[in-house]
Design a protein with these regions (language model features):
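Hydrophobic, aromatic-rich transmembrane alpha-helices
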Residues: 302-306, 369-396
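Membrane-interface alpha helices of multi-pass inner-membrane proteins
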Residues: 265-289
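Signature aromatic-anchored transmembrane alpha helix within multi-pass, membrane-resident enzymes
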Residues: 318-326, 444-478
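Perimembrane helix-loop-helix junctions
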Residues: 294-322
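Membrane-helix boundary/interfacial segments in multi-pass membrane proteins
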Residues: 54-63, 123-127, 176, 226-242, ...
Length: 626
């Protein structure tokens, strides 16, 4: 029941505020629903900012009141200043207008089913250290009554604002669900509704309101493996997934604005239309800055091509020069060192690996991957012929960057690929956005040749889509499931039994305690059950996040016999130690990094046993004098 309520709250938060604003501005149908999520997220982030400024609880009931007031205010302003932009291509009552909506509902159900089958339960933990700080940050926000994205860096070492976590905190507070259940509910809405609805809006903006085009876009959105399924298998990359899903509606608004500029649509109308892409891009960037870089890769070529084809050559030159400077400035930002190495393959792969990379972006099944790749290639060619070469550029550039990560030495490509962590999976997820447009171009071509009635084939399309959906369920669900239910014991970070044991031991800890626990043996999940500080918050080598942390990890058992260790313990403020638990396979690469914790036992001077539960033992560190 808590999951169903969280699902409803997440859907309402992601759509209702945005739809209210857009309807007030004169937008209807896909132009309201498809563009709603970026506007809604902007209002949710603003709600958190207001709560932060007022030092009040913005997560629970007060947050809903603030959101309602902000939505009403912005909707009122939109009603006063908006200049509706009519689409002359759309008839008053297009044939088959409900079919795209049905395709979105069906496709969303397929994606939600894949996720549900893979996860099994809304309280199942993804077995990767990312889940610790993503769900943990949401947990801490809820505990503090904060929905302010800027507070996230106080809880987790993430190099970007916490837009995802702020929204997840609001879903948690307003639904009453636990943070993990609320996060899964938010994830389900993002991949099964936000993503396909945004893609349909983008296809409509580029190719027009043809039902064949919109249905194809909706179906392609849930068939492509690179997004969302590959990202669901890769880890808890939920902020990146949401930011990438927001690219489609933001890009749609950018194209609409460019169209107005190209025909000199009037300053007031242009200024009103500019608000949506600016607000949407800002919201997506707060969720994950990679959205801004993705928008530059796909959107900038689209803007330049559209201006040039409209004869606005001088303006195109100005935009190109400004865009080049902005891109150079954005890519020259010095990122954290770990972003330069996070997902880099380091080179050494061959041509066959690159081919496999491209094909698996479409599907894991060889036959459907080959057919899909042919359709995408044909669509890219048709896009160029139709005056939308930027679709082909937006497809080729991310895949070329992903291929360069495989083929070239890491140091060569990281300068360009660091916004995506030099990770091929994130890069090919970006390529899915233009891929869907390319497939929609094929549908547009076929519909134009055969006519809408024969192109849709009322009986043939449902049968084909159902078959493809079944193939998706068969191929995607087991792969996603491996993230939640590893096949071998050494891939678990914390089994369900270990989670129960940690919850039991957490009750013995005083609030504000600082605990030294091996993250590779499940210890890091402890702070999700209690408001404590962990010396090693995520699954990394024992970095000196606190003074003497490395010394504590390696030689904690010598706290009474080694003055240096005593000083390190005193400086780091460690009050308790957690030992036991099964090791994750990733710990083997670190050698004896956490050996000092493992050696603590009943015969070790300086420690008092407090409790045991399951495979774990909780110890109090007796006071030592440096």
């Amino acid at each position: 029941m808590s999951y169903a309520l969280a699902l409803l709250v997440a859907a309402l938060l992601l759509f209702v505020p945005g739809v209210a604003v857009l309807w007030s501005g004169g937008r209807r149908g896909w132009r309201a629903w498809g563009a709603a999520p970026p506007v809604s997220i902007a209002l949710l982030l603003l709600t958190g900012a207001v709560g932060h400024a007022a030092a009040s609880d913005a997560v629970h009931g007060a947050g809903a009141v603030v959101l309602a007031v902000l939505t009403a205010a912005v909707a009122g302003a939109a009603r006063l200043i908006a200049r509706p932009v009519e689409d002359p291509r759309e008839p008053s009552r297009p044939r088959g207008r409900w079919w795209p909506a049905a395709a979105v509902v069906f496709g969303g159900a397929v994606v939600a089913t894949v996720l549900g089958r893979a996860v099994g339960s809304a309280t199942a933990w993804p077995q990767i250290h990312d889940s610790i700080f993503h769900v943990g940050a949401t947990t801490m926000l809820v505990r503090d009554g904060s929905a302010w994205a800027g507070d996230v860096t106080a809880y987790a070492r993430v190099p970007y604002p916490g837009g995802w976590h702020a929204v997840a905190a609001l879903v948690t507070g307003l639904s009453g669900a636990d943070p993990l259940t609320a996060s899964h509910a938010l994830l389900t809405v993002v991949v099964s509704v936000v993503w396909p609805v945004g893609v349909v809006l983008l296809a409509r903006t580029v190719w027009g309101p043809s039902p064949a085009v919109l249905i194809t876009a909706a179906v392609s959105a849930f068939l492509c493996y690179g997004l969302p399924y590959q990202l669901l298998t890769w880890g808890v990359v939920w902020p990146f997934l949401l930011a990438t899903a927001l690219l489609s509606p933001v890009l749609s608004q950018v194209l609409e604005l460019t169209g107005l500029v190209a025909v000199a649509g009037g300053r007031r109308r242009i200024a009103a239309a500019a608000a949506l892409p600016v607000v949407g891009a800002a919201a997506a960037t707060v969720v994950h800055p990679a959205a801004l870089y993705g928008l530059a890769v796909i959107g900038l070529p689209a803007v330049l091509e559209r201006l040039a084809r409209a004869g606005r050559h001088r303006l195109a030159v100005v935009v190109a020069a400004g865009g080049a400077l902005a891109v150079a400035a954005a890519w020259s930002v010095r990122p954290p060192e770990r972003l330069l190495v996070a997902g880099a393959a380091g080179g050494g792969y061959g041509a066959l690996d690159v081919v496999a990379l491209v094909l698996s972006t479409v599907s894991q099944h060889p036959l459907s991957a080959a057919v899909g790749a042919l359709a995408v290639t044909a669509g890219a060619v048709l896009s160029v012929r139709a005056g939308h070469a930027w679709v082909a550029v937006g497809l080729v550039v991310p895949l070329a960057l992903a291929a360069s990560v495989l083929v070239l030495p890491h140091g060569v490509v990281s300068v360009l690929t660091w916004p995506w962590y030099s990770d091929v999976n994130r890069l090919r997820a970006l390529a899915v956005v233009p891929s869907v447009l390319a497939v929609a171009a094929v549908a547009r071509y076929v519909a134009g040749r055969a006519g809408e009635a024969r192109a849709l084939v009322p009986w043939g399309v449902p049968v084909a889509v159902a078959g493809l959906a079944a193939l998706t369920l068969v191929t995607a669900a087991p792969v996603v499931s491996a993230l939640y239910h590893p096949g071998t014991a050494d891939r678990w970070w914390a089994t369900p039994a270990e989670q129960d044991a940690l919850a039991s031991l957490a009750d013995r800890l005083p609030r504000g305690a600082t605990v030294a626990a091996d993250p590779f043996r499940g210890g890091t999940f402890l702070f999700l059950h209690r408001d404590v500080t962990l010396l090693f918050p995520v699954g990394d080598p024992p970095l000196p996040s606190r003074p003497g942390a490395v010394e504590v990890a390696a030689r904690l058992d010598r706290v009474r016999s080694d003055p240096d260790v005593c000083r390190a313990v005193f400086a780091s403020g460690v009050t308790h130690v957690l030992t036991g638990g099964d090791a994750n396979a990733d710990e083997t690469a670190l050698g004896d990094a956490y050996a000092g914790l493992a050696r603590v036992g009943s015969g070790t001077p300086g420690f008092t046993e407090l409790a045991r539960s399951g495979p774990y033992t909780l110890w109090r560190v007796d006071r030592c004098t440096p």
